Amino acid sequence: VLLVGRWAKTVPQGGGASCVRGFNLVTPEQALLSALRANVKAVEKPNFIQLQKADIVVVATGTYDSENIERPFAMDEEDEALVRMACAANKKVIVLVLSGSGIDMSAWHDKVSAIIYGWYPGQAGMQATADIMVGKINPSGKLPATIEKSFKDSPAYGMIPAGLNISHT
């Protein structure tokens, strides 16, 4: 398994009220190593050949969210490019989204094997996420929120005051 992305070796969290420094944090890399007990290689910025040669690629991506920060609905351009490159290089791609809110996945959602929306997992949530990835547990439940397919589906669409330099593409 090739684990890639800026959050392959760290536990992401948002700012403001969602910023809680835990103890004994479990990273995506540590969680997958524990769940698989097999060869897991973590590379933040892989090249095309590394992606192509991997049996399975897991892209750990997402956004940074906090109160009083307006961010685009899109992922960071570098993260978006990594997902697209992984899809071009390999047929077995899992995208692990670690975020505090929705993102635009329309450019690649139909090109990946799976999407796991892990939100901000907390200090040990990555272990449960890894158990989902390896089939140890079957996730179920209902969300208290809606993840929009595009920003136009958001109740906030069209309500941003004129003059603000915010992109929602």
Regions found by a protein language model. Name each.
Residues 2-169:
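C-terminal non-catalytic regions of proteins with extracellular/luminal or membrane-system context
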